[in-house]
């Protein structure tokens, strides 16, 4: 809840010239905020894949200073205006720094499971195996909606187990997910392990999800969007993970 409030506060920053542009948007807005409080600051782009080598020469980028909102944390804010093809970025260094996706990866893991009919939009039920987990919400049967809402790790690990490592890796490569490195343990490759992705790559993938540039079944795309919908009104829809 505290993290959610921080994200909302950053996204609603009210510098007039910035908000004037935000209020004029009618297209889908994509935001990705990664707080990297325990990640070391890297002053130059590394050649070892730790940074996304983004060719921004042809991009329309506005740099915003949101350091007041981050406080003692090091991190980034990346917003892409789909209608105007324009970026607003706080801290380019961290915006290209690849880190573990952790629960944000569940968006795509769910999509892979849907594409392979492990789960379907109509039936995404997976039974709890009876193992005791540290969060009460995890100790129950789950659907995609409940598993996404409570960020239930075992649900997505179960999807992976049914998919198999080879199929998961094929999908990771197909959509170009970050460094595409699944060399870590198969049960946790996306949790502080080998798979890493930068905030800018996260936003690029969210744009592809919105436009279904993947060419996946529209009903599967919509099922994932529904599962990560936080609120919706006449003003727009807010998604998050």
Across the structure, where does each feature detected by a protein language model lie?
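Cytosolic-facing loops and C-terminal tails of multi-pass membrane proteins
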Residues: 2-61
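Beta-lactamase-like hydrolase cores
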Residues: 46-95
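A glycine-rich, coil/turn loop motif that links secondary-structure elements
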Residues: 97-100, 133-138, 185-197
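Active-site SXXK
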Residues: 99-123, 147, 202
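Short, well-structured active-site flanking segments
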Residues: 115-131, 217-221
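Acidic helix-start/capping segments at beta-turn-to-alpha-helix junctions
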Residues: 124-140, 146-152, 163-164
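Mid-domain, small-residue-enriched loop/turn segments at the edges of structured enzyme/sensor domains
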Residues: 143-144, 156-210
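Short, Gly/Ser/Thr-enriched beta-strand-loop segments that form substrate-interacting elements
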Residues: 230-241
């Amino acid at each position: 809840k505290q993290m959610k409030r921080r994200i909302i506060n950053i996204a609603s920053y009210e510098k007039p010239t910035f908000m004037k542009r935000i209020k004029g948007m009618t297209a889908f807005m994509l935001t990705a905020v990664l707080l990297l409080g325990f990640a070391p600051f890297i002053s130059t782009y590394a050649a070892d894949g730790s940074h996304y080598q983004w060719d921004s020469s042809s991009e329309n980028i506005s740099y915003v200073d949101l350091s007041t909102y981050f406080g003692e944390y090091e991190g980034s804010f990346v917003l892409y205006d789909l209608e105007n093809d324009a970026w607003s970025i706080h801290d380019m260094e961290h915006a290209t720094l690849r880190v573990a996706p952790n629960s944000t990866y569940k968006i795509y893991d769910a999509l892979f499971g849907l594409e392979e009919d492990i789960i379907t939009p109509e039936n995404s039920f997976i039974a709890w195996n009876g193992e005791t987990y540290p969060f009460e919400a995890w100790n129950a049967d789950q659907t995609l909606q409940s598993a996404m809402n409570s960020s239930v790790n075992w649900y997505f690990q179960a999807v992976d187990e049914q998919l198999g490592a080879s199929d998961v890796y094929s999908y990771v490569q197909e959509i170009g997910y970050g460094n595409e490195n699944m060399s870590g343990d198969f049960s946790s490759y996306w949790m502080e392990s080998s798979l890493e992705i930068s905030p800018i790559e996260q936003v690029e993938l969210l744009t592809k999800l919105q436009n279904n540039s993947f060419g996946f079944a529209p009903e599967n795309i919509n099922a994932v969007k529904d599962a990560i919908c936080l609120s919706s009104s006449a003003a727009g829809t807010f998604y998050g993970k």
